[in-house]
Regions:
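Phosphate/pyrophosphate-binding betaalpha-module
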Residues: 183-193, 224-237
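Catalytic PLP-binding core of fold-type I/II PLP enzymes
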Residues: 265-278, 282
Length: 381
């Protein structure tokens, strides 16, 4: 009996304390809503100070953080040391033109084909394997989240998304994206799917300043673009990224989806019953940063139901701005509480068992890609 009591006490004492918003200040809760970035390759005093004072919930890796394999792993290890063990550390790794892991110079990641090639092959087992490779290599550097897969549907020849999309056929997108998703999460990596509610039909790139329009009715959107999101919501996806395109036939204005309560709250939350974390595409992208004030972006997005922001321009500045808006009544503090709780709950679920594995750039994975996608052999030699 004494032994059982001792073991129970030992396990309780050694279990890492879970995060909770109960003892967080307003500023700390706002900090959870930020996914920050620093273009450096080692965690310096300025970053340490920012992590400890502002307590951001996430960090997005850029090419500047991914210089060499060992330095990258050390950088991410230090992020956890100063930002919290289960800080959300995410990286863009779609394949094709968007794969940050290939920036690592001294140890080459497996080069992933673009989504269009994956859709053209349309082999579910291959798509799962690709997701598995992505998840394994993301976890190998120590990160725990990836912006993949892309769920947008459209013709690559006319869409601003190009070959980042799997197909213009919704069924091909659904089946292959679902397998990529499963391969990623089977490595204990969070899959952040994008770009809700679908930007495949826009010809304007939201990175630029021009307003990006999708001229679809809700019925048209529901029958096509929303179907991959519905599929993955039913499969338990934990994070959905909302894009910056506008849907005037649905919202009756040109407000970007990322700032629209109709898109985020009415459709994603209430209609589709998504209960995870809602993230929006980077706040420094031209479509919103050049057309809305910084204050308007955060106030409108939070009031719409957005939980997390990528690439804020200075953590303290943004926390100050949001805190002031809460205190003035422009943002209900309950919206902050809801966001912080969703993010904290996600962080508490993150598993560390596969993190920092040694399965980065394995020759067997590169050979697999070569066998299935011959044009990509040159990158995987």
């Amino acid at each position: 009996m004494c032994l059982i009591v001792f073991i129970t006490i030992f396990l309780l004492c050694n279990k890492e304390k879970e995060l909770s918003i109960d003892n967080m200040s307003l500023r700390e809760k706002i900090g959870q809503m930020l996914m920050v970035y620093y273009n450096i390759d080692e965690v310096d005093e300025d970053l340490i100070k920012s992590l400890e004072e502002n307590k951001p919930g996430g960090f997005i890796l850029t090419g500047a953080n991914l210089i060499s394999y060992d330095r990258t792993r050390k950088f991410i290890s230090d992020l956890y040391k100063y930002g919290g063990k289960n800080m959300i550390v995410a990286v863009d790794q779609e394949g094709g033109s968007v794969q940050r892991l290939y920036d690592i110079k001294d140890k080459k990641a497996t080069f992933i084909p673009n989504a269009y090639e994956i859709g053209k092959l349309n082999d579910k087992s291959v798509s799962y394997k690709i997701g598995n490779i992505i998840g394994t290599e993301v976890s190998s550097i120590g990160a725990n989240a990836v912006f993949s897969p892309v769920l947008d549907i459209g013709d690559y020849k006319t869409s601003a998304m190009g070959k980042r999309m799997i197909s213009d056929d919704k069924d091909i997108v659904i089946s292959n994206a679902s397998e990529i998703y499963k391969g990623i999460i089977d490595n204990d990596v969070i899959s952040i799917v994008k770009h809700f509610p679908g930007i495949g039909d826009t010809v304007d790139d939201t990175h630029d300043s021009k307003v990006s329009i999708v001229n679809k009715t809700y019925e048209e959107l529901y029958n096509t673009d929303l179907q991959p999101f519905i599929k993955l919501i039913n499969e338990g996806v934990e994070v959905i990224m909302v894009g910056h395109s506008s849907y005037p036939k649905i919202t009756n204005d040109n407000l970007p989806a990322s700032l629209s309560s109709i898109i985020v709250n009415d459709i994603l939350r209430n209609e589709l019953k998504f209960d995870g974390v809602v993230m929006i595409d980077a706040v420094n992208m031209g479509t919103i940063s050049n057309n809305y004030s910084e204050k308007d972006i955060y106030v409108k997005a939070i009031n719409a139901g957005v939980n997390m922001f990528i690439m804020p321009n200075g953590s303290k500045r943004v926390i100050d701005l949001i805190e002031k808006a809460v205190k003035s009544g422009e943002i209900d503090e309950k919206m902050i509480d809801d966001s912080a709780k969703r993010i904290v709950d996600l962080r508490n679920k993150i598993s560390n068992k596969n993190k920092f594995n040694n399965n980065f750039g394995l020759s067997i994975n590169k050979k697999f890609i070569c066998e299935k996608f011959h044009d990509y052999c040159i990158y995987n030699e």
